[in-house]
């Protein structure tokens, strides 16, 4: 895959064609002294402070590339003969670390361009140990530095996604990464660098503002790529116990650790039950959270009191939920009743008659003491009077026999719901968009009230060969303009002068 940084090497593209990242990388081209680059005198370079200031003032990545062409990166160790980093390269790495952990907030587009240079696997191999040391000593109050670090790392790809091209091969022939052992284990040490940096982030003293962005990102993009995902358990369990909002964001990672890596969390369902409240349904991540709830409650071996408690809690949340969350929750409740037949008692029970007679304790956090099995899903009857037609129809499932097949849990955004309702004609039949939606959904019979519309009685004497073949012709009056024509039409032209009429 071509890298965006290649646009800065137009002049050297043909010269570096032989130095591509393939099996012949360690072979030197003809008429080139391989040792000259290592043995030549190191030119003067910027100090750590100067390079940090240089990065802060840079406008384009091309400026950094031009500076890299003027310095020497590697040299031969006089004692061992190994290829080691020069003082200029060490200053460059340290200056970049100070730039990243500075007091100035760096914009994401700038860090995206920076990552195309310092995120390449060879220079990142030299940066990662210094990053780990700096992260260890980074304080929680350094919010700006934490955000700069997170934004930079989010642009560094994992080798399973993409292996970047080497940076140093653009400037010098011999590098430590030309060694056969390094090339053979390239994917291994690239993955190790990736793991070490992210584990240092999770073990660091992270800013509270950053954790709200860090938890979803690690859950979706990092945890599945770590060599040992179970090592992230300390971070996620700590976040799970921190606050309700952190706990909700950590649900996905906690579920993966429990289901895939055999972790145990005492009273896990009690914790999830306490997090299930109406405020959860106003979050932007409510779709993924409801999907996780469905996964948590998918086992048919769950005790009935746990399922009944979640049924009642979700039913109570429905009364305060936004419109875009009501349809999915109704589908989830219906699937739970189908999945756990023992909970069908909540559907057919006639009590309570009033809210105050409901034995269910919504404030109780212990699932053993909620008394949900003694209650009923009276909230569904209340939702049958909802202003939205789709919600009304879905709430009618309690009036029908329990189905054997679970229904599809449909998520629709507020804009889609608004457009569907606006497509309906007021006081008449549904609009064309509404009719099209019904044909696409195909679930009107399943979610309806169960009362089919009565067929219209046909009048005797009509139909068959006696039916009228054509409608009666109706003559309507047409308005006539009696005023004389004006403008270009107001000309005296004989009727027989056809060419002149065409010219007009």
Swiss-Prot record:
Q: Out of the domains of life, which is the source?
A: Eukaryota
Query: Which cellular component, as a GO term, is one annotated location?
Result: Noc4p-Nop14p complex
InterPro entries linked to this entry: CCAAT-binding_factor (IPR005612), Noc4 (IPR027193)
Show the segment(s) annotated as Disordered. Answer: 431-483
- One of the Pfam families matching this protein, by short name: CBF
The UniProt entry's GO biological process terms, in alphabetical order, are: ribosome biogenesis
Which PANTHER family would you find in this protein's record?
NUCLEOLAR COMPLEX PROTEIN 4, NUCLEOLAR COMPLEX PROTEIN 4 HOMOLOG
Q: Which family does it belong to?
A: Belongs to the CBF/MAK21 family.
Its name, as the record gives it, is: Uncharacterized protein T20B12.3
């Amino acid at each position: 895959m071509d890298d965006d940084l290649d646009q800065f090497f137009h002049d050297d593209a043909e010269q570096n064609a032989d130095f591509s990242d393939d099996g012949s990388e360690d072979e030197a081209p003809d008429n080139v002294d391989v040792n000259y680059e290592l043995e030549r005198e190191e030119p003067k370079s910027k100090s750590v402070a100067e390079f940090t200031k240089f990065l802060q003032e840079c406008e384009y990545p091309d400026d950094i590339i031009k500076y890299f062409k003027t310095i020497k990166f590697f040299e031969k160790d006089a004692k061992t003969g190994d290829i080691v980093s020069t003082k200029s390269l060490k200053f460059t790495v340290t200056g970049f670390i100070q730039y990243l952990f500075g007091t100035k907030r760096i914009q994401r587009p700038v860090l995206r361009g920076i990552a195309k240079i310092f995120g390449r696997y060879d220079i990142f191999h030299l940066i990662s140990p210094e990053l780990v040391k700096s992260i260890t000593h980074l304080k929680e109050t350094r919010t700006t530095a934490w955000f700069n670090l997170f934004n930079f790392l989010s642009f560094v790809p994992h080798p399973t996604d993409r292996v970047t091209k080497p940076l140093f091969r653009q400037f010098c022939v011999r590098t430590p990464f030309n060694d056969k052992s390094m090339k053979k284990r390239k994917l291994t040490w690239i993955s190790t660098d990736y793991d070490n940096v992210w584990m240092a982030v999770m073990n660091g003293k992270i800013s509270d503002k950053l954790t709200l962005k860090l938890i979803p990102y690690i859950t979706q993009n990092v945890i599945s790529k770590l060599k040992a995902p179970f090592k992230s358990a300390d971070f996620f369990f700590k976040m799970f116990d921190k606050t309700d909002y952190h706990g909700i964001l950590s649900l996905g990672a906690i579920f993966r650790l429990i289901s895939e890596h055999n972790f145990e969390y005492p009273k896990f369902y009690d914790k999830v039950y306490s997090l299930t409240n109406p405020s959860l349904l106003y979050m932007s991540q409510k779709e993924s959270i409801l999907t996780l709830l469905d996964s948590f409650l998918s086992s048919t071996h769950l005790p009935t009191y746990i399922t009944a408690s979640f049924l009642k809690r979700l039913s109570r949340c429905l009364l305060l939920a936004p419109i875009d969350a009501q349809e999915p929750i109704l589908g989830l409740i219906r699937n739970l009743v189908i999945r756990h037949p023992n909970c069908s008692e909540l559907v057919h029970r006639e009590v309570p008659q009033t809210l105050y007679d409901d034995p269910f304790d919504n404030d109780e956090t212990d699932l053993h003491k909620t008394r949900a099995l003694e209650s009923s899903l009276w909230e569904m009857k209340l939702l049958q009077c909802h202003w939205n037609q789709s919600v009304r129809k879905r709430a009618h499932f309690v009036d029908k026999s329990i189905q054997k097949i679970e229904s599809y849990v449909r998520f629709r955004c507020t804009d889609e719901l608004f457009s569907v309702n606006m497509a309906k004609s007021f006081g008449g039949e549904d609009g064309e968009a509404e009719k099209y939606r019904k044909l696409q959904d195909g679930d009107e019979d399943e979610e309806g009230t169960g009362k089919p519309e009565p067929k219209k009685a046909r009048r005797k004497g009509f139909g068959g060969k006696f039916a009228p073949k054509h409608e009666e012709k109706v003559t309507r009056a047409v308005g006539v303009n009696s005023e004389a024509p004006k403008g270009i039409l107001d000309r005296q032209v004989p009727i027989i002068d056809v060419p002149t009429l065409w010219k007009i």
